[in-house]
Design a protein with these regions (language model features):
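Active-site-proximal, Lys/Arg-enriched surface segment
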Residues: 1-46
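Acidic, metal-coordinating catalytic cores used for nucleic-acid/nucleotide bond scission
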Residues: 92-100, 119-121
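An anionic, glycine-rich sequence signature occurring as long contiguous blocks
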Residues: 115-210
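Short, surface-exposed basic-aromatic patches at helix termini and helix-loop junctions that form
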Residues: 103-112, 130-131
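Glycine-rich phosphate-binding "P-loop"
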Residues: 53-75
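A general structural motif
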Residues: 34, 49, 86-88, 110
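Short, basic/hydrophobic alpha-helical segments
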Residues: 68-90
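Short, conserved catalytic/metal-binding motifs centered on acidic residues
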Residues: 1-9, 39, 73, 91-96, ...
Length: 220
C-alpha cells in the first residue's frame, strides 16, 4: 500500500520566494510556505515504512490557481505510478483525495484505492446512503477483561459525484464500541476494491495504516 500525504516544511510572513505558496490569515496578513506531497509504502502490522520520491507543492507554469495537494498527487501518479505498478498498489488517502478526478488518476496508473470519506464533504454520497440498507459485520473481542465491538457497514455501487459519468465505488464505515456501547472511534471510506464480510475488516485496517506514514514524517 502507498500512502501519500501533504506536509509543510517552511512558513514565514517575511521570508518568501517565487516557489512559495500563500494563504491569508484572519488578521489580514499573508503567510508564505513550502509544502510537499510525501509518499510511503506501508502495511498493516508493520512498524516500518518505506519512503518514496516526493512531489513539491509549488506554483506551476501557466496555472491560474495556486497548486494544491490533489494536483501534486496527480503529478506524482503520472511520474512514479508506472515504477510501482508491479506492486499492484493500493493507494491510501485522506478526505481530500476521495473525489472522482483523483480516483480516476489512480486507476489510470493501474492502482486501486481506499480513501477516507467524510459525510460532510460528500453530499451526493450522503444522500445516496440515506435510507439505504447497509450490509453489516460485527467482531467482538475481550482483552484484559474489557469488551470491544467493532461494527463494519458497507454499500456497493455508490456514485462519487452527480451525473451520468460518475464512478461507482463501495462505501464502508468502521465503528468501535466499548463494553458500555459507547462509541470510541468512527470513520468512513470509499474504495474501488470488492467489499464483503470476509474483506471489510482488512480494508478498514489498511486505511488506518496510513497514519504511520504521517507520524514518521512528523518526527523527522
Amino acid at each position: 500500500m502507498i500512502a501519500p500525504d501533504g506536509t509543510e516544511h517552511f512558513c514565514s510572513r517575511k521570508i518568501h520566494c517565487a516557489r512559495c505558496s500563500t494563504r491569508k490569515r484572519s488578521d489580514g496578513g499573508t503567510e508564505y510556505f513550502h509544502a510537499f506531497l510525501g509518499a510511503s509504502i506501508v502495511a498493516p502490522g508493520h512498524k516500518q515504512v518505506l519512503p518514496l520520491p516526493r512531489e513539491f507543492i509549488a506554483p506551476q507554469d501557466g496555472a491560474a490557481k495556486q497548486d494544491c495537494e490533489c494536483n501534486a498527487a496527480k503529478r506524482w501518479l503520472a511520474k512514479h505510478g508506472a515504477s510501482v505498478v508491479h506492486l499492484r498498489p493500493v493507494y491510501l488517502g485522506d478526505d481530500l483525495f476521495s473525489h472522482q478526478p483523483l480516483v480516476e488518476a489512480i486507476q489510470r496508473a493501474n492502482g486501486s484505492c481506499i480513501l477516507t470519506c467524510k459525510p460532510a464533504s460528500h453530499k451526493i454520497i450522503s444522500e445516496y446512503l440515506y435510507g439505504a440498507t447497509l450490509e453489516e459485520h460485527r467482531e467482538t473481542t475481550i482483552t484484559r477483561g474489557k469488551r470491544t465491538t467493532t461494527v463494519y457497514r458497507w454499500l456497493s455501487g455508490v456514485p462519487l459525484r452527480d451525473g451520468r459519468d460518475a464512478l461507482h465505488v463501495s462505501w464502508l464505515s468502521m465503528e468501535i464500541l466499548n463494553g458500555k456501547g459507547k462509541r470510541t472511534y468512527y470513520n468512513s471510506f470509499v474504495t474501488d476494491l470488492a467489499v464483503s464480510a470476509d474483506t471489510v475488516a482488512e480494508l478498514a485496517a489498511c486505511d488506518r495504516t496510513r497514519w504511520k506514514s504521517r507520524m514518521r514524517r512528523s518526527m523527522c
